[in-house]
Amino acid sequence: SKDYMVKDTYDLILANPPFKGTLNKENISESLSAITSTTKTELLFVALFIRLLRVGGRCACIVPDGVLFGSSKAHKNLRKELVENQYLEGVISMPSGVFKPYAGVSTAILIFTKTNAGGTEKVWFYDMKADGHSLDDKRQPIEENDIPDIIERFHHKDNEETRERTEQSFLVDKQEIADNDYDLSINKYKKIEYIPVEYPPTEEILAEIEQLNEQIAKETKELREMLAK
């Protein structure tokens, strides 16, 4: 709100704000509107975190994935702020079931440092597949868990330089992100590896179909004879 004017206060912010909502425009602080002019709370929260941090302070916040690729001017301005004016370190894409049974939306973690002077050269992307729990409403423990791997790779980002875009994590140059309207969705940059599939000749497939039809006809005839007795 306009009454809450705290700024440049915190060294670290870890947040999971409400995913979606709106505020009346007259109730929004001008300092937030200066970052991105919007009434959407998922964007305003990120702007608020930027304002609350001291220079050098860091933030890891969860956002709905629409924040990463939304095409509105407000979405683009917020992403541009993170990439151009702050130091955006990483984007961790999470599967849609991680917040079930409460919410089924796809989300991501934005990791950034407040600099007010830029600093982003490359952004680290990670495609999380599993978090140690099933992705249904029960959220039961399972063996698959990417979190230890995320921590390991994040703390050794120098090793990410040689990773291919087909892998689970990789780095993307700032300029490439800027050229794509500051899109921060991993699917924008990830390369899909297609494995060629070889099929048998058409004549061979037709021969198999004919053989199956003959077998079906034979067994159907036998079944009818059994029923007729």
Where are these predicted regions, by residue range?
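A conserved structural/catalytic subdomain of Rossmann-like adenosyl-cofactor enzymes
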Residues: 3-229
